[in-house]
A protein has these predicted regions:
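Polytopic transmembrane helical bundles with strong interfacial aromatic enrichment
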Residues: 1-143
């Protein structure tokens, strides 16, 4: 029961993250002007990351109860990555973006580095989520 709940949360997390990439982001940039898209993204990203943190933490707990070690380790790594994105990277990205808009030359390089780190963490989390499925189902079918 616990392992099934963890796998279900893993699927939910992958769905939430994928829908943001496939639906939300492209829609924002196609329908909103720069000012409104900036405001929307600054509002949505912390909430997205916190929601994903909640799901991944619950996933970790269910994997812990099921004694699925791989899921536990990966689940906690994913949870930590969302905390890093929410409380470390996002505020700095926003600050560098604001400085860029005022003409601060050095801030563009820093913005790109921080944004790249944020996207990389997000995509690595998705890879880790898929790896949980692979490990779980390969164990299941090898029994």
């Amino acid at each position: 029961m616990f392992i099934g709940s963890g796998i279900l949360l893993n699927a939910l997390l992958l769905g939430v993250m994928t829908s943001f990439i496939v639906v939300t982001s492209p829609t924002v940039f196609k329908t909103l002007d720069e000012e409104h898209s900036k405001n929307f993204l600054r509002f949505i990203f912390p909430r997205l990351f916190n929601f994903c943190f909640l799901i991944s933490t619950l996933m970790f707990l269910f994997f812990a109860l099921a004694e699925f070690s791989f899921g536990m380790v990966v689940g906690i790594a994913i949870s930590i990555s969302f905390l890093i994105n929410t409380y470390f990277l996002t505020p700095r990205i926003n600050k560098m973006r604001d400085l860029m808009l005022t003409g601060h030359v050095e801030s563009e390089k820093q913005f790109k580095k921080l944004h790249f780190a944020s996207v990389l963490l997000y995509l690595l989390s998705m890879v880790f989520i898929v790896s949980i499925f692979i490990v779980y189902y390969s164990r299941l079918f090898s029994l």
